[in-house]
């Protein structure tokens, strides 16, 4: 099933596994995060502006940085929620002003945002008390704003292997 999933998208095999993992290559090399690399529980504010952003537009952009030094799992584990950057973000911000607007909006709530992947959604770890209703009310019209918590293991993990 993971091989079929890989043809659908690089993140599909990861989601089929249902566990936090370090993923390399184009999604085919998956190492579960366990022990000292396991992610701590955390809350996140996820913001989706109304405009979408086609993945192929980002990956075909001439200004996409393609020579970033490889990251390591140990480096990630040392500061998982502050680790690294998303090379897709500058291109996404150029192609979709809503990405920049959402990042700036998060900053008004003292949150450090970054892109979730290759789409227009952004997220920020919430490390302080947050009045969710007030925050959602302050969002521009048609934005989706959700408070989410990470999962160490998805509740349906293992269903695809049974």
Which stretches of residues belong to each language-model region?
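Residue-level marker of motif borders
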Residues: 6, 112-113
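Conserved, helical-rich catalytic subdomain that frames metal- and/or nucleotide-binding sites
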Residues: 17, 22-112, 127-162
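Conserved post-catalytic alpha-helical subdomain immediately downstream of the catalytic base
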Residues: 1-21
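Short beta-strand->loop micro-motif that forms the acidic, two-metal-ion catalytic signature
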Residues: 121-127
